[in-house]
Amino acid sequence: LLKNLDKVRVFDATWYLPGSNKNAQIEFDKTHIPGAKFFDIEKNSDLDNKLPHMMPKASQWKNIISNYGVKNNDHVIIYDNSELYSSCRVWFSFIYFGHNPNLVSVLNGGFKKWLIENKVVTSKTKNYNKSNYLVEEKENLIIKKKDVDSNMNTKKFFMLDARSRE
C-alpha cells in the first residue's frame, strides 16, 4: 500500500461502541494513513431508519461515495483501528453497491499493524473532487427477514449465528 498511495483510495472506517470513551474522528484527525478519508459509519448509514447503522439506500450511497470523490474504477482500501472490524462493514457496502470486488480490499492488520511497522502517518487531509459514482445494488447479497422466516421450514440455506452467547 505504501508504494501505491497515489493510485488507490484509502478509508479509515474505525468505529467504537457508544460509551467506549473513544472518538474515531478525533483519532483520525490526529493520525492516519496519508491520503485516507474518514468513513463515518454513523453518518453514512440509513439515517431515515429507526434502527442504527442500517445499510444506506442506493441513492444515499451514491451521494456518500460521490462526495468522497471515489470513481467506480478506483481501487479502494479500507482499514480500521478498533476491535470491531468495522472495515469489513464498509468493504461489504462497496461490494453490495456494485464496486468491483477485485477493487475493494481490507488492509491486512489494519492501522495497528501499520503503526507497528512504523509506516508513514499524517494529520493532513487530502481533498478529492466530487465524482459521479454509479450504484448497482447486488440485492442477492442480503437475505431479508421473510427469507429467514421461510427458511425455518424449507431449510433452503444454512444459517450460522456468529454472535457471542452473551
Give the location of each predicted region:
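Aromatic- and Gly/Pro-rich amphipathic surface segment
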Residues: 29-68
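Glycine-rich, phosphate-binding/catalytic loops in enzymes
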Residues: 27-29, 95
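Short active-site-adjacent helix-start/loop capping segments
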Residues: 18-21, 45-48, 84-87
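Flexible, polar/low-complexity N-terminal or interdomain linker segments that lie immediately upstream
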Residues: 1-26, 34, 111-166
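Thiolate-centered catalytic microenvironments shared by cysteine-dependent enzyme domains
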Residues: 52-146, 150-151
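General secondary-structure edge motif
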Residues: 16, 41-45, 74
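A structural signal for short, well-ordered beta-strand segments and their strand-loop junctions
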Residues: 10-12, 38, 77-78, 103-108, ...
